[in-house]
């Protein structure tokens, strides 16, 4: 999207900063993200992954191509309730994740105050914490693995999660 209305919606977050992005991409698939990475690499345009926009420090605004994965890449891919593990897409909102985990007697313990809007991708990018962090830890203590696309378009795996065949698909 190149229109000023759409770009304006992504020019701010919960911080005091305002910066108009060059464009906004709302990917439907991971191939869309890879194509966006290639375009940015070929044109020298910066990219900015954006999730809930709940940061009060301005990490989600910049003069860049903003990629918003919250609209379509927001599901639980796999759930292993017995081992208390799941594979999720980066755009899933924390409250929605916990709503889907609750019938299995599970919940994700990192409890940010913006849980109705904060996404797992954004929480991972910021290593989020919350009021229960002293007991249950912060994001790095509760995430086993992340798969991420690098600027050259390659997929890198961080951590180890052999029992799940799917990547965590977190930028």
In which residue ranges do the predicted regions lie?
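Extended, hydrophobic alpha-helical segments in both membrane/secreted and soluble proteins
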Residues: 47-49, 56, 97
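Short, basic and Ser/Thr-rich N-terminal targeting/leader segments
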Residues: 41-43, 50-52, 118, 142
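N-terminal flexible segment immediately upstream of the FAD-binding catalytic core
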Residues: 1-42, 54-84, 113, 136
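Residue-level detector of anion-binding/catalytic polar loops
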Residues: 45-46, 107
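FAD-binding subdomain of flavoenzyme oxidoreductases
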Residues: 75-79, 86-171
